[in-house]
Amino acid sequence: MVELLPKLKEVGRARGLNLSGGERKMLAIGRALMANPALLLLDEPSEGLAPLVVAHIAEVLRLVKQAGVTILLADQNLRFCRKVCDRGYVLEKGRVQLEGTMDEICRDEQVVRKYLAV
């Protein structure tokens, strides 16, 4: 586990309350992975984190996926999802508006106009 999340070794025995948001997310992911799950459920794993931490978590999740763990996540960060996920679903008001590969979703004109326009 420490190989995937070396930051956990650095924080050692620190109490969870003393950890940064990114360290807490990594700790939560690490704890979940210790059970050798077949399925990992994540709710907003990139929320409120610095871009470097988000990139690190994306890399960890890619490695976890390569190891055969299925990952189901909900997140608003499309760049993060594109790095981690094979497929995606766009939800609006609790209903699926679009589903497909991440490339298909990112190329969809309605998604770009509605959710990615600045």
Which residues does each predicted region cover?
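A short, surface-exposed alpha-helical micro-motif characterized by mixed small hydrophobic
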Residues: 81-83
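H-loop/switch region of ABC-family ATPase nucleotide-binding domains
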Residues: 75-76
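ABC ATPase C-loop
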Residues: 32-33
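Helical segment within the ABC ATPase nucleotide-binding domain
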Residues: 55-67
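Conserved ABC ATPase signature
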Residues: 15-19, 23
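Conserved catalytic motifs of ABC-family nucleotide-binding domains
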Residues: 36
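Catalytic Walker B motif of ABC-type/P-loop ATPase nucleotide-binding domains
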Residues: 40-44
